[in-house]
Amino acid sequence: MDLNISTALRSFTQRYIDLWQQQTGHLPASKDLYGVPSPCIVATGEDQVFWQPQAFLPEATLTNIERALEIQLHPDIHDFYTQQYAGDMMADLGNHRFTLLQVWSEDDFIRLQENLIGHLVTQKRLKLSPTLFLATTSSEMTMASLCNVSGNVVLEQFGSDKRTLLASTLSHFLDALRPVLPE
C-alpha cells in the first residue's frame, strides 16, 4: 500500500524528532538557522535554535512555478513542500546520506520556488527531463529528486542525464529513510 505524501512526511519527521530526543534529550536543533525567523522555533539557545514542525499556513501550492514555466508539476511535490514548516533533516538510505530539504518560513518558501524554477530552466536548456530536488548530498553536484514525469525518486547528477532509481514513489522514499543526527 502506498502511503500518501503527507502521512509519509509526518511519519519521517516524527522519527527524526524521536531520534533527537532519544540521543540528546531535546528537540532538533540547528546552528545554521540561528537568527532566521520561523514559526518552527520553540526555543533559542546560545548559538542554535530548537524547532518542531508547524502546519504550513496559509495553505499553499507550487502553482506559481507551473504558471511561470507553463509546466504541470507532479502532485507529490506540492504535497511534499507545502505540508509543514520544518528544519532540514538528515537521513540515510542505503549508502547515501541526504539532507532532506524543508521549508523554514514564508520567506524560505519564496526562495525555494525561485530555486526550483532555476533548476527546471537549467534542465530545459540542457534538454533533460524535468526533476524537482528533494534532498542534497555531501556533493554539490548530486541530489535526490522527484522525476516530474514518472514520480520516481532518483539520485541525479546536476546538469546530466545520469540518474539512479532510489524509490518508485516519494512516499516509499520517505518511508525508507533512516533519520540520523548531524555530525
From Swiss-Prot:
Its main location: membrane. It is found in: Cell inner membrane. The keyword Lipid biosynthesis does not apply. It holds the Pfam family Syd. It comes from the Bacteria. InterPro entries: Syd (IPR009948), Syd_sf (IPR038228). GO terms for cellular component: cytoplasmic side of plasma membrane. Keywords: Cell inner membrane, Cell membrane, Membrane. It is a peripheral membrane protein. Interacts with the SecY protein in vivo. May bind preferentially to an uncomplexed state of SecY, thus functioning either as a chelating agent for excess SecY in the cell or as a regulatory factor that negatively controls the translocase function. Belongs to the Syd family. This is Protein Syd. It comes from Yersinia pseudotuberculosis serotype O:1b (strain IP 31758).
